[in-house]
Design a protein with these regions (language model features):
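Short conserved segment of the HATPase_c
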Residues: 84-96, 138
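Glycine-rich ATP-binding loops of the HATPase_c
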Residues: 123-129
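Short alpha-helical Gxxx[C/S/T] motif in the catalytic ATP-binding
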Residues: 111, 115
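Short helix-loop "hinge" at the ATP-lid/N-box region of the Bergerat-fold HATPase_c
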Residues: 51-52
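A conserved beta-strand-to-alpha-helix junction within the catalytic ATP-binding
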Residues: 1-12, 63
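Short beta-strand/loop element within the Bergerat-fold HATPase_c
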Residues: 59-71
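Glycine-rich G1-box
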Residues: 16, 82-83
Length: 144
């Protein structure tokens, strides 16, 4: 599965949100991986969509890259959004877990749980680093 084609599809699916928020989504040259294209599209769509949803007053900037780590590819999805405190980083992958009220940020609280399930189904791992007020970086692996 060509990762760049997948990201373009995810961006097309999010084209209204990207246009309305004036988000900038960029990516480096990305690998071809053995993965279900529909699930990989959903994974990127959820991560990019969250970056747009949880942006600061300025427009969202999202950058996607990948590095070969020998037996796996590590994908990095980095944004300049509102970020979150470190105490919440593990909880966000739990289904229906929300850090904000629906009034502040719409959503169901299942997107990142779906991301985790997709990555695990492909034999990978997903984790996050974040700094409140600076942004969030999601990492996930897909075996080579």
């Amino acid at each position: 599965t060509d990762s760049e084609t997948i990201i373009r599809q995810a961006m097309e699916n999010l084209n209204v949100a990207i246009a309305e928020s004036q988000a900038m989504v960029t990516y480096d040259a990305l690998p071809t991986v053995i993965a279900d294209p529909t699930q990989l599209t959903q994974l990127f769509q959820n991560l990019i969509g969250n970056a747009i949803k949880f942006r600061r007053e300025t427009s969202a900037n999202v950058h996607i890259s990948a590095q070969n780590q020998g037996n796996e590819w590590t994908f990095v999805v980095q944004d300049n959004g509102i970020g979150m405190e470190s105490e919440y980083l593990e909880r966000i992958f739990t289904i229906f877990q929300r850090l904000h009220s629906r009034r502040d940020y719409p959503g169901t609280g299942i997107g990142l749980a779906i991301c985790k399930k997709i990555v695990e189904r492909h034999g990978g791992r997903i984790w996050v680093n974040s700094e409140l007020g600076i942004g969030t970086t999601f990492y996930f692996t897909i075996p080579v």
